[in-house]
Amino acid sequence: MNSLFRKRNKGKYSPTVQTRSISNKELSELIEQLQKNADQVEKNIVDTEAKMQSDLARLQEGRQPEHRDVTLQKVLDSEKLLYVLEADAAIAKHMKHPQGDMIAEDIRQLKERVTNLRGKHKQIYRLAVKEVDPQVNWAALVEEKLDKLNNQSFGTDLPLVDHQVEEHNIFHNEVKAIGPHLAKDGDKEQNSELRAKYQKLLAASQARQQHLSSLQDYMQRCTNELYWLDQQAKGRMQYDWSDRNLDYPSRRRQYENFINRNLEAKEERINKLHSEGDQLLAAEHPGRNSIEAHMEAVHADWKEYLNLLICEESHLKYMEDYHQFHEDVKDAQELLRKVDSDLNQKYGPDFKDRYQIELLLRELDDQEKVLDKYEDVVQGLQKRGQQVVPLKYRRETPLKPIPVEALCDFEGEQGLISRGYSYTLQKNNGESWELMDSAGNKLIAPAVCFVIPPTDPEALALADSLGSQYRSVRQKAAGSKRTLQQRYEVLKTENPGDASDLQGRQLLAGLDKVASDLDRQEKAITGILRPPLEQGRAVQDSAERAKDLKNITNELLRIEPEKTRSTAEGEAFIQALPGSGTTPLLRTRVEDTNRKYEHLLQLLDLAQEKVDVANRLEKSLQQSWELLATHENHLNQDDTVPESSRVLDSKGQELAAMACELQAQKSLLGEVEQNLQAAKQCSSTLASRFQEHCPDLERQEAEVHKLGQRFNNLRQQVERRAQSLQSAKAAYEHFHRGHDHVLQFLVSIPSYEPQETDSLSQMETKLKNQKNLLDEIASREQEVQKICANSQQYQQAVKDYELEAEKLRSLLDLENGRRSHVSKRARLQSPATKVKEEEAALAAKFTEVYAINRQRLQNLEFALNLLRQQPEVEVTHETLQRNRPDSGVEEAWKIRKELDEETERRRQLENEVKSTQEEIWTLRNQGPQESVVRKEVLKKVPDPVLEESFQQLQRTLAEEQHKNQLLQEELEALQLQLRALEQETRDGGQEYVVKEVLRIEPDRAQADEVLQLREELEALRRQKGAREAEVLLLQQRVAALAEEKSRAQEKVTEKEVVKLQNDPQLEAEYQQLQEDHQRQDQLREKQEEELSFLQDKLKRLEKERAMAEGKITVKEVLKVEKDAATEREVSDLTRQYEDEAAKARASQREKTELLRKIWALEEENAKVVVQEKVREIVRPDPKAESEVANLRLELVEQERKYRGAEEQLRSYQSELEALRRRGPQVEVKEVTKEVIKYKTDPEMEKELQRLREEIVDKTRLIERCDLEIYQLKKEIQALKDTKPQVQTKEVVQEILQFQEDPQTKEEVASLRAKLSEEQKKQVDLERERASQEEQIARKEEELSRVKERVVQQEVVRYEEEPGLRAEASAFAESIDVELRQIDKLRAELRRLQRRRTELERQLEELERERQARREAEREVQRLQQRLAALEQEEAEAREKVTHTQKVVLQQDPQQAREHALLRLQLEEEQHRRQLLEGELETLRRKLAALEKAEVKEKVVLSESVQVEKGDTEQEIQRLKSSLEEESRSKRELDVEVSRLEARLSELEFHNSKSSKELDFLREENHKLQLERQNLQLETRRLQSEINMAATETRDLRNMTVADSGTNHDSRLWSLERELDDLKRLSKDKDLEIDELQKRLGSVAVKREQRENHLRRSIVVIHPDTGRELSPEEAHRAGLIDWNMFVKLRSQECDWEEISVKGPNGESSVIHDRKSGKKFSIEEALQSGRLTPAQYDRYVNKDMSIQELAVLVSGQK
């Protein structure tokens, strides 16, 4: 009992004790003693049970028990302790101990256990007494066990089946324990029936154990799949498919990853479960109901899961369309808003001359052209808005029922929902919806199965607002153009003014026109470069862009003369009139124009090169895809293998030609790669020089990679199909040739039926011909088997070909976006089915012909015997009847008895023949099934248990190799993807940022807030600069009074420098700065020492001055203040201090930047799940690079070890082949080939093996019995054939002599020799088993030591890098893997223990074989006794003849005839029995041929002559080591894959703009905090210095006269004022930092706004026009007075409730959107303005938001 005070149910046991007072100390001691006694009882129970189990094992082995007295004494001691425990527990309960009830309950359970233990003790040790005098009614016990077993059923759920397995294991052990007792009951005749019943019981128990094991395994795997499917379905039902979910891209990636990688494997597992269930049902498994229920559940859940996959795909498409539409509309609105702001700001006519207005008019013309083109975009968005699905309704119940459409079929409790049908949504409950069908029936179904069809009111409103915005912009552009034209006409009529100014303005206008033209062309170039190519027409789009670039080139050629003329005129004007007012501006414009033109030429050249390269790349990609599509579509047309041989040849030639064509066209891939590299180079040049990134590069790289994969897949597809065709052709030719030959032979077989007119010679001729024909038919059986093997090969080849075709079709459907149920077309019938039918028909025909001819042979033999016996019968009738002695009558009676026995046996054989024929017809109707051809070979084979273990290890090893291969392929793919991402990161780091800016739009409110924060941050920066200038000025003034600079900041800097080890270049620069800093510090220290010396001297002089007169003091002070050297010294120190401060600020900035990078890296490493990453281009950590290099070296080493392990495995396999080839070479090869190629279910194999062994045993027993019976019959016949002797003899003495049969004696001797030999073999096997177990235990210990050492090494290695959190997590995972490996080793140990149990079971089987031999010996003894009895009867007959001395014995003719007839009947019955036995054997062979017609042939060696364990055991150990090598390499590959996946996920999600903004704000916040800390430190330092200066000033003020006091007072006042300003500045900084932190927190938290909003606006109807006016407009129009205006304004409101979920939980505020104020509900509750009852009324919607807002705001 581990703990006495664990929680239990309260018991009712409470013994009566005397109540007495007891202290707390005594109570605690009582509880302690009670705990000790209970532990002692628990220990006694455990010890007693262990010793009783050991004694029970000894009793079962027939030995005496050892621990009878010890166990009895411990039981008595436990009972005594229980009495004490009950009394102590009663006392504790009486004293109201808190755990008194639990203590009493535990003691009650202990008492029950001790009572059960005593009963078990009596039961066990009573067996020892019964062994001496056995009185058990074994027959009743066996009957009881058999009845109990027959009444057992199979559970319907997994826990019940597990319980049944445990119960039956106990039951089976009990059944096995009965066997030795039955074997000890002697050789009584009545015991044979009991043994037969026991064997039946044992067989039934073993069968139930196997059935339970198979059912448990099948139900466990079905339960695992059902749990996975349930979790997947629940995840999809609970997923948010509404507009609120913005994480749909990751869901799309997850969905595509599962579809491409895991769906096929999962479907194979589901299909495997169905096939295994069908096999169990076909084998008539007794747990049929449970298997069918689990099969139906898996099928239903898998069907539901496929339907949910269809729904998920549809929802992802709707979400993408929804969000893409909103992003496009937002972009369009931003563009139109920008155009509108440009029209307002840029195109105003005020303060512009004629030339500027002329330039603006030209720009407006271009703007109108752009707007005309943009009209198509707006109309397209309006059309798309009509197709957008209203996702918002998925998260809220609409005001009225709306129609929904079903995406899949779903069977609910209320009814069936059909795909494509429309229903009405009544209520939205989140995960499930309440619906109503067309008939008015209410249904409840998951929301994921439905979609709300278009249109979306919000999308329509957005599209309409976009259209109205577009029209307003067009109108404003037209109005601006009219205004500018009017202003232009006015300016044309005005006086031009000064000629030089007019000329300058003209030149400026010309340059502005050229510049605007250049800007327009640059925009056109960037407009060509920035948008990605259209997916469907990339080649045409790139060609059109090339044409556009040519047009831009022509435009530049047109602009060049004008640019040259304008710049030349401008330069001439500048030289002619350098003093003019427009000359500086004109010079700047000329330089800008020339620079812009050169920039534009370079950009145009690179753009043309990039577009040309992209065009070539897209063309090559298109050609390659078209070529692949041609071949793939051609291959996709073939569903199966052609039937005729000629078409097979043509198809093979066609595939060979296609393979050659693919090899010849492989150069296209090289061309594509070259074009891709050229595109990368052009894109990198554009990105580095002009910051123009290529948006198509990532897609093009993916296309090239995908093209290479598709090309390789197509080439492999062609190769595999060609191999399958070649194999199918060869197999089909062999099959067809053999089939036609055998069929022709079977058809042309002659018929030798007996006729009534046939003579004896004709009958003999027919019989001879029939025997020859039957031998010839039997010789053709091998040919039929070969034909079946060829058929199987052909079917397998066709199946492989069809599998490749199905793979290609699935791949093309997935690539083309077709669904499986859409793309399925009519399939041709497989020729394998036809060949299979022909094979079955041929086998049936052969079996039928063989049976018919066998029957004909029997008929001929029977007719021939009748013809031969006919003359004897006639002679017998003509013989005279004479008397015969009594011995002839007795002999006739015996023969008649034998005749009856033979007749009964013949009847049994006929019934068996009929049952076999019925089974043959059943098999014919059912189709061919699996069969096993059994060959008996006398050879040494391994132990079957070890062989099975060896096969299991081989399968495990193959699975591990397959998994490692898959992981290796996945690792290579991830490495390729990682290298591609790293290359993109190195080539163009800003590419993803630009892309995200174009595609990802942050929340509008968040964007506004970020902009506001940016503006405030800029203001803070400007204010910080001003404050820093003030601080520097203050430092200059106070520097003269500073005594020593605080070293704390330097120490902090040094500490941070130690940590900055990420960038070697920065580290080197920082080391250089540190050295310079140290030199400056040394110089500063020297100067400070000089300053301190001068200050000490100054103090000393001041003290001396204090002792002198006032005038002298004044003069001395003036001299000290005006000392030029000191002033120079102070100014030098001030300058040095400023330099030091500047350097410190620079180093602080560097430190801050490095810290920011470190934090960014740490955040990136820590954020594994969160998808918000910062796109920062940083240099990697050198240690991380070295660690990566080490890991790569380790990976290479592990790959080398993996290859070594594979080579070693191959060598082991070759050794295994050599071991299997021992003995007859041909047989070993055939067996090895067949066993490796085909593998059946191990449980079915065990059952077949057991049945084969039983058949062999029965067959051998029957053969031996038949042989002995035949010998006895020969002896009987010999005795009958001996003629009676006439003897005249006088008997003097009667002597009875019994002699043993020599043959029987020899047989007994041989059996005894065999028995001794088997006993020796058993001893050798036991000795070998003990040695093998010792070797296994030793190997397990060695393996465990090796694995523990590996774990320790890995832990030490991983702990060497404590700075990397990701590495540490990887190390923790590796430790978990090693722990799981230890668990696997423990499981392996348990498996070996089970194998030991299996060996013990084999020994028991050997014991049963010995019993069978003993029974055979007893049967031989019985036959010997019978033979002796027959001899005795013969002797008695002779003695009887002897007593009648002179009587002449003659045969009675009548008796002689009867005797002859009986003998003929006996021989005839024997002959018929032999014929029936032959026919039965023939039918059995036919049955075996029919059973093997469908599946592969297996050659099973069933006779184990000598069990050898050593080589196989070593082989198992070697395979275990190789398996561990494979597992270790798999774990290492898993670690590498997980690391690469983590890094890949970091690179993929590294481009989030919102995360970048937040991190930027965090960095700014951190900088401000650092500045705040620095300012606080500087403030404290300056305050201390000012305090010192103030002290000195007070001293000086006390010592100096009035004229000097004024100067000191003014200086002190200025210092105090500066100190106050600095304190105020610090407080302001603190407030600003807190405000920024609050805003940052508000940006960081996730907002969830409750849809509770009230807005009331009041309008006034104009009485004349009817137009709606606001109160303000009505007041301005004079419709209402001021008081009415104030009253109406007060009635307007715009309240909104906002619920914010932040780090501190959820909080709600009332937002007055009209005034911008926010009122917290929590504060109102705390202050009492709002009561909880009122708030509950609001929550229950009994109070409006307006009333709540009035209460919260306090506006009562």
From Swiss-Prot:
Location of region: Interacts with BFSP2 and VIM: 1557-1756
Spectrin repeats: from-to residues: 216-317, 323-485, 505-612, 733-861
InterPro entries named among the record's database cross-references: Desmoplakin_SH3, Plakin, Plakin_repeat_sf, Plectin_repeat, SH3_domain, Spectrin/alpha-actinin, Spectrin_PEPL/EVPL
One Pfam family of this chain: Spectrin_1st_PEPL
Molecular function GO labels: cadherin binding; structural constituent of cytoskeleton; structural molecule activity
Protein's cellular compartments: Cell junction, Desmosome; Cytoplasm, Cytoskeleton; Cell membrane; Cytoplasm
Plectin repeats: 1651-1685, 1700-1735
Domain of life, per lineage: Eukaryota
SUPFAM superfamilies attached to this UniProt entry: Plakin repeat, Spectrin repeat
Major subcellular site: other
Keywords of this entry: Cell junction, Cell membrane, Coiled coil, Cytoplasm, Cytoskeleton, Keratinization, Membrane, Phosphoprotein, Repeat, SH3 domain
GO cellular component: cornified envelope; cytoplasm; cytoskeleton; cytosol; desmosome; extracellular exosome; membrane; plasma membrane
Keyword DNA-binding: no
Coiled-coil features, chain-numbered ranges: 16-125, 188-389, 585-820, 886-1645
Residue numbers carrying Phosphoserine: S14, S465, S887, S949, S1584, S1657
Tissue-specific expression: Expressed in stratified squamous epithelia and in some other epithelia.
Record function comment: Component of the cornified envelope of keratinocytes. May link the cornified envelope to desmosomes and intermediate filaments. May act as a localization signal in PKB/AKT-mediated signaling.
Family, as annotated: Belongs to the plakin or cytolinker family.
Subunit structure, as described in the record: Homodimer or a heterodimer with EVPL. Found in a complex composed of PPL (via C-terminal linker domain), BFSP1 and BFSP2 in the retinal lens. Within the complex interacts (via C-terminal linker domain) with BFSP2. Interacts with VIM. Binds to the PH domain of AKT1. Interacts with FCGR1A. May interact with PPHLN1.
Protein name: Periplakin
Organism: Homo sapiens
